[in-house]
UniProtKB/Swiss-Prot annotation:
Its main location: cytoplasm. The keyword Cytoplasm applies. This is Translational regulator CsrA. Coiled coil: none annotated. NCBIfam families: csrA, PRK01712.1. One of its GO terms (cellular component) is cytosol. The keyword Cytoplasm applies. It is found in: Cytoplasm. One of its GO terms (molecular function) is mRNA 5'-UTR binding. The gene is csrA. Belongs to the CsrA/RsmA family. A key translational regulator that binds mRNA to regulate translation initiation and/or mRNA stability. Mediates global changes in gene expression, shifting from rapid growth to stress survival by linking envelope stress, the stringent response and the catabolite repression systems. Usually binds in the 5'-UTR; binding at or near the Shine-Dalgarno sequence prevents ribosome-binding, repressing translation, binding elsewhere in the 5'-UTR can activate translation and/or stabilize the mRNA. Its function is antagonized by small RNA(s). Gene3D superfamilies: Translational regulator CsrA. Homodimer; the beta-strands of each monomer intercalate to form a hydrophobic core, while the alpha-helices form wings that extend away from the core. It comes from Pseudomonas putida (strain ATCC 47054 / DSM 6125 / CFBP 8728 / NCIMB 11950 / KT2440).
């Protein structure tokens, strides 16, 4: 696992087309923004595990774009 340190407003880039930006930190929560192509699925881990287990994905909301 690669471990990086970023400040609010800073980003990392993955594969030239995915950008992850730190939007804010409040206590133990970190808000991140993810810019990715439409064909790249982005899910929270607990949603991804549900999808893998065959459960239906929840309705479209903040997890998808």
């Amino acid at each position: 696992m690669l471990i990086l340190t970023r400040k609010v407003g800073e980003s990392i880039v993955i594969n030239d087309d995915i950008k992850v930006t730190i939007l804010g930190v409040k206590g133990m929560q970190v808000r991140i923004g993810i810019d990715a192509p439409k064909d790249v699925q982005v899910h929270r881990e607990e949603i991804f595990k549900r999808i893998q287990a065959g459960s239906p994905a929840p309705e479209k909301h903040e997890d998808t774009h």
